Swiss-Prot record:
GO molecular function per UniProt: ATP binding
Binding site for ATP: G268, V269, E270, D271, S272, G273, L274, V275
Designated name of the protein: Schlafen-like protein 1
Pfam families xref list: SLFN_AlbA_2
Family the entry assigns: Belongs to the Schlafen family. Subgroup I subfamily.
Coiled-coil annotated residue ranges, if any: 373-407
UniProt KW keywords: ATP-binding, Coiled coil, Nucleotide-binding
Biased amino acid composition, Pro residues: 154-185
Disordered: annotated span: 141-203
Length: 414
């Protein structure tokens, strides 16, 4: 009975999804095989993704929520139910069920490297002193568990370590595919391909304000708000987002917007710009307001209430729900010009900056010094321009004064 169960589990990981009552592709006769140009390779199949070296300080729900947000950043959206987080004494990892073509999975390491360089991955997601590990299949889990935590977990669907009685495909998984080297221009071409997946048309934060979305009584589910910009960030939310991952995003994005030109964080909107909404009751609104206020009160220098606005916009949907759908909008107004450059830090002493479509931080001491040097250099250039303008005006006034004095000294004798 154990042998049959293990065989069924093993076949589930290595074969594509098959409807009940229908033969699998391996059982089809050779003459009925699909042609080479039928596009079968492009059809997404179910795979298991291993994500290792997660931060054990977070609970399982928090890690699942943060991991889902990270995979969405890597253009690999998954549902919360498809993420299984396992906490071990020496390694906390997750098993994620994804439906994607092989080419997408093959490019994941390079997408991850690019996202790490652009500060798109939350630093707190990874265990201290380690790097985030992404690999396909359960073989990597088996080897890593032997290296990090001793014997493999009991719930692993892999075969027993004993010798295999034969080359039966029910007990042998195919080896992990070798990841091909990225193309030379993947850095720019990859980002261009990701951006092409979004709807055309970009609207800035000011354009959305001009359309009176702030004063509008409702939004319609499925409406298009444009694409993410330097001062506009979308989050899908949903599930336990408000109670788990939202506070981390408040720290990162509010601090980054304060240190740049302001901006807005919209929760309940997909990365593509389509409105979906999140389930948010009046009690959730009160808790969210208290959470935002408590976090921003710890910022340095102090952030006053008039520096930000928290709005809950109702979402009209065709389906009836017991809890209303809303879009949460946290807007950070453009910081007022100060006599000297100010750099805001969170209640945890971290500093973030807003880049085009990404967040940089937490900044190191050297990066903060470079930021201050650039800000002071920019302020010095502005002051030098003002001095040049005032000097030119002074010379013009002195020239006009000399001309008037020359005219007043001349006299006519009759």
């Amino acid at each position: 009975m154990t042998l049959r169960k293990r065989s069924a589990q093993t076949k589930m990981w290595e074969s594509p999804v098959v409807s009940q009552g229908k033969p699998s592709l391996l059982e089809l006769p050779l003459k009925e095989s699909l042609p080479k140009d039928s596009g079968l390779k492009a059809v997404p199949s179910t795979h298991t993704l291993y994500v290792g070296h997660l931060n054990p300080q977070f609970s399982v729900p928090v890690l699942a929520c943060l991991l889902r947000d990270t995979l969405e950043r890597l253009e690999l959206p998954v549902a919360r139910e498809q993420i299984e987080v396992v906490r071990r004494p020496r390694n906390t990892y997750a098993l994620v069920q994804v439906a994607a073509p092989k080419a997408v999975l093959a490019s994941l390491p390079w997408r991850l490297q690019m996202a790490l360089e652009e500060q798109l991955i939350l630093k707190e997601l990874t265990a201290r002193g380690k790097e985030l590990v992404l690999s396909e299949g359960l073989e990597s889990l088996h080897h890593r568990e032997q290296d990090d935590s001793g014997p493999s977990p009991s719930h692993s669907p892999g075969p027993s370590p004993g010798p295999s009685p034969g080359p039966s495909p029910g007990f042998r998984r195919p080896p992990l595919p070798q990841l091909a080297d990225p193309p030379p221009n993947w850095g720019s071409a990859g980002r261009r391909q990701i951006s092409q997946n979004r709807p055309s048309g970009v609207r800035s934060d000011s354009a959305i304000v001009h359309q009176k979305i702030l004063g509008q009584e409702q939004l319609f589910q499925g409406a298009f708000l444009g694409s993410e910009t330097r001062n506009m960030e979308f989050k899908r939310g949903g599930g336990e987002y408000l109670s788990l991952a939202f506070k981390h995003h408040v720290r990162r994005y509010v601090c980054a917007f304060l240190n740049s030109e302001g901006g807005s964080l919209l929760v309940g909107v997909e990365d593509s710009g389509l409105v979906q909404g999140i389930h948010c009751s009046h009690r959730d609104e009160d808790r969210t307001r208290l959470l935002v206020d408590s976090i921003l009160q710890g910022f340095k220098p102090q952030v006053f209430p008039d520096a930000y606005t928290l709005t809950f916009i109702p979402v009209i949907s065709t389906t009836m729900t017991s809890v209303p759908l809303k879009v949460l909008r946290l807007t950070v107004h453009t910081p007022k010009a100060q006599g000297e450059p100010q750099l805001y830090e969170t209640d945890q002493g971290e500093v973030f900056l807003r880049r085009d479509g990404s967040i940089q931080g937490p900044l190191s001491v050297g990066a903060i010094q470079d930021w201050c040097r650039q800000k002071w250099t920019a302020e010095l250039s502005k002051l030098e321009e003002k001095v040049d303008v005032l000097t030119l005006e002074k010379e013009q006034l002195q020239e006009q004064l000399r001309q008037r004095q020359t005219l007043s000294c001349s006299c006519c004798v009759l």
